[in-house]
Structures are given as C-alpha cells and as structure tokens.
C-alpha cells in the first residue's frame, strides 16, 4: 500500500493583501497528478488545511474539489486539524463523507480516532491525532496532570491500544523536538510546545505537520 503524505496547505493565505488561492489551486492540481503517477492508495493530510479557523468560502470550495479529485479513483484520504484550523469546521459532515473514503478527525472527545485498512500481508491502522492544546486534553481527562503539550499527548497515547502485530501510522500536528524549522511556523514561547519524538515509538510511521520543511526525525522509515 502506497501513501502520499502532505500537510500545511494553509488554503486562503494572503501575502501583502494578495490572495494566493490561484497559486494554491495550481499546486493542488500538481499534487493530484503526483498521487496518480505514484499510484498512491491513500493520502495523509497532517493539519493546517486552512490559513484561518473560519476559512472563506473560496478556500473551502477549493479543498472540496481537491479531495473529490483524490478519491475519484477509489483512493482514501485522511485529514486532521492543525493549529490554524477549527476542528468542528474541518470535521463537519465527517460521518457522511466516510462513505466516500474521506476520514476526518473529529473534535477531541478524550480518545484518538483510528481507521483500519486491509493490506496484502498485514492490517494497517491509521491513527489521527489533531492539534491539541493542554487545556483541551485536561478538560476531557481531568484526572491527568497536564501542564505541557507533551503531557497532553502522552495522556492521550496512554489510552491508545496500539497493536504491534499491525502496522501503525499516526497523523500528528505538533512541534517535535529536533525538527528543523523555517520562518513561517507559529511557535510557543519558551518551547512549551515541544514534544519528544520518543513518545511515538509505538508507531511505524508518524506523518507530521506543523513544520514547513520536509525532513526525517530520529529514524528513517
């Protein structure tokens, strides 16, 4: 099974009051062509679909058309929300569009969502961890001591039964310690949003978003 991993589309972004939507539309067409040429079975979109939590109608229409083209040949699409997105907005109609092969992380309810895919030799489980602030996790898991982003993610992962007999992929939109940043990301003061990569050791592949530079962290997969 072949996966195409992307993130941080930031649809609707402007530069000096100039809309980038025409350029973004051209890039999305290229991505669809890459997915077709590489015969990708699924596409992983790891957060920050939109530039704003309340995206303009044109940006939403562009993303809708993009996803529709991706799934037209039976391809699966997995989407999580990032720090720029509104989880309720991203996940609107999520239960309905699952029938089309589009899986969107819903607003956090205390557990992490997953989808199991059948492959030729072993099942593949795709886990979806949207961007979560410590306060969001604390609200759902009041018994946990949560002060940092790492505390929050670890609390969620402790409640996640990852089966090592299966192949496990995680979509995640957080800042991972050791990643190389560019000048376009939003960071928390003092590095409070840092999460150590070792917390994800149970997963075979972690599809990261949030950092606007392709890279590998700790290990090759």
Describe each region flagged by the PLM:
Residues 75-83, 102-103:
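Hydrophobic or amphipathic alpha-helical targeting/insertion segments
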Residues 45-48, 80-83, 208:
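Glycine-rich beta-strand-to-loop/alpha-helix junction loops that act as flexible
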Residues 38, 74, 163-165:
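A structural signal for short coil/turn segments at secondary-structure junctions
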């Amino acid at each position: 099974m072949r996966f195409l991993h992307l993130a941080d589309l930031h649809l609707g972004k402007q530069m000096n009051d100039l809309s980038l939507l025409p350029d973004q539309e051209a890039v999305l067409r290229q991505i669809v062509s890459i997915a077709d040429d590489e015969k990708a079975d699924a596409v992983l979109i790891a957060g920050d679909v939109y530039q704003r939590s309340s995206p303009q109608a044109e940006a939403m229409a562009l993303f809708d058309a993009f996803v529709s083209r991706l799934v037209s040949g039976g391809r699966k699409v997995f989407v999580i929300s990032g720090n720029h997105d509104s989880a309720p907005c991203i996940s609107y109609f999520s239960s309905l569009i699952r029938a089309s092969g589009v899986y969107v992380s819903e607003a956090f309810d205390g557990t992490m969502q997953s989808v199991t895919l059948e492959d030729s030799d072993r099942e593949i489980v795709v886990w979806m961890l949207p961007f979560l602030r410590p306060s969001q996790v604390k609200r759902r898991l009041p018994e946990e001591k949560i002060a940092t982003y790492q505390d929050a993610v670890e609390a969620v992962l402790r409640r996640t039964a990852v089966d090592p007999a299966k192949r496990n992929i995680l979509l995640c939109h957080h800042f991972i310690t050791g990643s190389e940043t560019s000048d376009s990301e939003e960071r928390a003061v003092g590095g409070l949003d840092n999460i150590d990569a070792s917390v994800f050791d149970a997963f075979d592949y972690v599809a990261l978003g949030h950092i606007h530079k392709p890279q590998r962290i700790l290990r090759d997969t």
